[in-house]
Design a protein with these regions (language model features):
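Asp-based, Mg2+/Mn2+-dependent phosphohydrolase catalytic module
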Residues: 27-28, 54-58, 74-182
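Short, acidic loop-to-helix structural element flanking the phosphoryl-transfer center
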Residues: 39-69
């Protein structure tokens, strides 16, 4: 499952349908399954902030940089949780969600859309990703990509996906941020 993190919901559902049923999911099936998944997601208690994430975002903003969210999700509840956990940190009009793109990660379109929304060139941005598909998408978009291994995968998987740098945790990235940005 972690290898598919970052895909749009529709893409993930189609992969499962093809693997398990040998067919494409209909639009109605996708909507029904995504709806059920959203209900399940919202039934879970709210996750705590990842250690180092808030401090890193504060450093980013203090340097005059604009943090942006690029997610394969389209769940309003996820975006609301981001605002709750990181108040005032992200501008909704600069977020890229599943509804903004035709192709999800690992396609570069989500990050290319972020560049467009932010009025940036690839060499003016940095991607921070925790999943192989997101790392691959950032790399394919030509953006310097930092991988943070927050999951069960071997770090080499993230490097093989195209990460320029790899950190074992968000806290480790935060602690090294000033050195990286020199």
């Amino acid at each position: 499952a972690y290898m598919h993190e970052g895909r749009t919901g529709a893409s993930t559902i189609n992969i499962v349908f093809q693997r398990e049923l040998g067919k494409e999911a209909t639009q109605e099936e996708i909507e029904s399954i995504y709806h059920e998944k959203s209900i399940l997601f919202n039934s879970y208690p709210e996750a705590e902030r990842m250690p180092g994430a808030w401090e890193l975002l504060q450093k980013v903003k203090s340097e005059g940089l604009t943090p942006m969210v690029v997610t394969g999700s389209g769940q309003l509840s996820l975006l609301e949780r981001l605002e709750h956990n990181f108040p005032g940190m992200f501008q909704k009009e600069l977020m890229v969600t599943a509804f903004d793109v035709k192709y999800g990660k690992p396609h570069p379109e989500p990050y290319l859309m972020a560049l467009k929304k932010g009025g940036l060139k690839a060499d003016e941005a940095v991607v921070i990703e925790n999943a192989p598909l997101g790392v691959e998408a950032g790399h394919k978009a030509g953006i310097f990509t930092i991988a943070v291994n927050t999951g069960p995968l071997d770090g080499q998987v993230l490097l093989d996906a195209g990460a320029d740098l790899l950190f074992p945790s968000m806290q480790a990235l935060c602690d090294s941020w000033d050195t990286i940005m020199l």
